[in-house]
Amino acid sequence: SLFKKDIEFNNLGTLIIDEEQKFGVDQKEFLINRYPQIHLFSLSATPIPRTLQMSLLGLKELSIIRTPPSNRIAIRTYVQKYEQVSFLTAINNEISRNGQIFIVVPRISHIPFVESEIKKLNLDISYRIGHSKMKEKDIEEVFLSFSNGEIQCLISTNIIESGIDIKNANTLIIFNSNLFGLSQLYQLRGRVGRSDKRAYAYLFHDSEKLINKTALKKLQVLANYENLGSNF
């Protein structure tokens, strides 16, 4: 609504843009041009190249937050070709400590495969599904049931990329992770490890014969930068 021309502010002094990478250049320029005197703060864990370059060139002031919240523990990140035994182990380890699990796929059409794997492995877990094609009220109901601990596992697309804070969910399993962008993976990994418990992220990918070296290197970069306060 801020981008509508018929909305006016009498004395707007400060504008904070969270998740800055999700806004387009035209949207940000519109606000800057319309309110040239305001103090503007942009927040992002994964800044777009244009914003990062302007900061490094000194055209924008840059501050880096390196201190994590107290009691946080680094997320253990594993990159590997998908194997049923790894999937089984990841789920059983989290369930054994009464935790919850995010399972993420890049496309809605991949969800049936995950469900079939759960059945093949006889995994006794309760789960719900969430994706962008569902009605908004249905998505909210699924998220609420997961947040309240009524189900153990949430299978979804990357709609959980931001705005989700569930401290009891400390295992993230991503299928076909090579189909996600690096910033998407970074944001998704941030859905776990939001308490004082050790969190785990499993980035499953296709056979190394089926993905190119660049995609594999991208995944490995994320695994290498798993310490608290690290970035790329």
Task: Pin down the residues of each PLM region.
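A short beta-strand-to-loop transition that corresponds to the Sensor-1 phosphate-sensing loop
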Residues: 1-2, 20, 43-48, 56-59, ...
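Short amphipathic alpha-helical segments
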Residues: 7-11, 27-30, 53-56, 114-117, ...
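Conserved helix/coil segment N-terminal to the catalytic DExD/H
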Residues: 1-14, 25, 137-145, 162
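Post-DEXD/H (motif II) to motif III coupling segment of the RecA-like Helicase ATP-binding lobe
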Residues: 8-96
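C-terminal helicase module of SF1/SF2 nucleic-acid helicases/translocases
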Residues: 84-232
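Homeobox/homeodomain signature
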Residues: 2, 13, 38, 42-47, ...
